[in-house]
């Protein structure tokens, strides 16, 4: 490749490597770059803190089009190394060149786990590693490899904190459309498909008015200390109904923080915040609940990488609802989902 660029010996793509190949297409990068919440949060965290980046060596894990690398260079970084497996890196090289930053940005094509940086340690790692439900198709395990191998003892991660939140929602119309649809498909019974539809979480934007409980943190990550095995987790939860309503699903989203900044910068992908391309994740229950304000739904959510594809997720939710009045029946379910 022209310019200040390197390519690892083992970086050739294969037809089977769909995940990395999907990031070679322009559409996904356009969607991410146009996500103002995402991109401006990174820009502000980096460029409003030049005192942290000045004369520092920075590693950009999964650099994509190079936007974060260029933010770092503009913030005063001595040199930025961007690593990406996808073929998009060829265009990133040209983008860096036309922005006259080739003298301070080196792009390397390859897997982070396999490449060798030309430096022993870096001062800062930046990465936009998050996926749906935070962990679906995420690169966090790759960021942790980079952290353990290259980050200086007093180094910084951007971002460095992440949380997943869980709440419940009323969603009768869409649940009927998504699940009930299979009972009568142009006069035919397609119900054998329903059990598979139940298992697939829906990634979509949910109106804030649908949320009818408080939220509960089910995962809280400090990227400076978290280990790969921590990404498979089991967490109890308790959420409280905020009004008399029906519950048709659980809703999850994540929040991100850059706490190393002079003024910490945060953003949320939840229904009470501005739209992001991550949207929210809906887990429909088999049973519908009738709740009254102040009543609790208690349970446990378990998440682990799927066997055979660690970027997919197996998620189990077990919950119990005990109404206050004895004439109302308790409800409990054990639900299993696959994000794929």
UniProtKB/Swiss-Prot annotation:
The cellular location(s) given in this protein's UniProt record come to:
Nucleus
Instruction: Output the CDD domains linked to this UniProt entry.
Output: AdoMet_MTases (cd02440)
Entry keyword set: Methyltransferase, Nucleus, Phosphoprotein, S-adenosyl-L-methionine, Transferase
Cite the SAM-dependent MTase PRMT-type domain residue spans from the record: 16-311
This protein's record includes keyword rRNA processing: no
Q: What is its main location?
A: nucleus
Q: Where does S-adenosyl-L-methionine bind?
A: 29, 38, 62, 84, 113
**Location of Phosphotyrosine modifications:** 19
What does the UniProt function comment say about this protein?
S-adenosyl-L-methionine-dependent protein-arginine N-methyltransferase that catalyzes both the mono- and asymmetric (type I) dimethylation of the guanidino nitrogens of arginine residues in target proteins. Asymmetrically dimethylates the polyadenylate-binding protein pab2, modulating pab2 oligomerization.
Q: What is this protein called?
A: Protein arginine N-methyltransferase 1
Species this protein is from: Schizosaccharomyces pombe (strain 972 / ATCC 24843)
Identify the coding gene. Answer: rmt1
């Amino acid at each position: 490749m022209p310019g200040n660029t390197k390519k690892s010996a083992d970086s050739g793509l294969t037809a089977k490597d769909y995940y990395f190949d999907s990031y070679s297409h322009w559409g996904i990068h356009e969607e991410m770059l146009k996500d103002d919440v995402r991109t401006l949060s990174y820009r502000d965290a980096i460029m409003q803190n030049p005192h942290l980046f000045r004369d520092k060596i920075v590693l950009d894990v999964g650099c994509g089009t190079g936007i974060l690398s260029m933010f770092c260079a503009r913030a005063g970084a001595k040199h930025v190394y961007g690593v990406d497996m996808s073929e998009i890196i060829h265009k990133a090289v040209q983008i860096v060149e036309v922005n006259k930053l080739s003298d301070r940005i080196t792009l390397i094509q390859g897997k982070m786990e396999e490449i060798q940086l030309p430096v022993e340690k870096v001062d800062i790692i930046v990465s936009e590693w998050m996926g749906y439900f935070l962990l679906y198709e995420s690169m966090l395990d790759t960021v942790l490899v980079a952290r353990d191998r290259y980050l200086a003892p007093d180094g910084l991660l951007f971002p460095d904190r992440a949380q997943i939140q869980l709440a419940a929602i009323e969603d009768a119309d869409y649940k009927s459309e998504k699940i009930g649809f299979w009972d009568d498909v142009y006069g035919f019974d397609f119900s054998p498909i329903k059990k598979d539809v139940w298992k697939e979480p829906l990634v979509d934007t949910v109106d804030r008015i649908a949320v009818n409980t408080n939220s509960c943190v089910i995962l809280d990550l400090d990227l400076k200390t978290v280990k790969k095995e921590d990404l498979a987790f089991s967490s109890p939860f308790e959420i409280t109904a905020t009004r008399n309503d029906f519950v048709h699903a659980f809703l999850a989203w994540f929040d991100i923080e850059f706490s190393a900044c002079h003024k910490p910068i945060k953003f949320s992908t939840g229904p009470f915040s501005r739209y992001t391309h991550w949207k929210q994740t809906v887990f429909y229950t088999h049973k519908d609940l009738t709740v009254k304000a102040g009543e609790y739904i208690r349970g446990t959510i378990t998440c682990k990488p799927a066997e055979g594809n660690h970027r997919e997720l197996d998620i189990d939710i077990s919950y119990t609802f005990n109404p206050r009045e004895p004439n109302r029946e308790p409800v409990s379910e054990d639900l299993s989902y696959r994000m794929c």
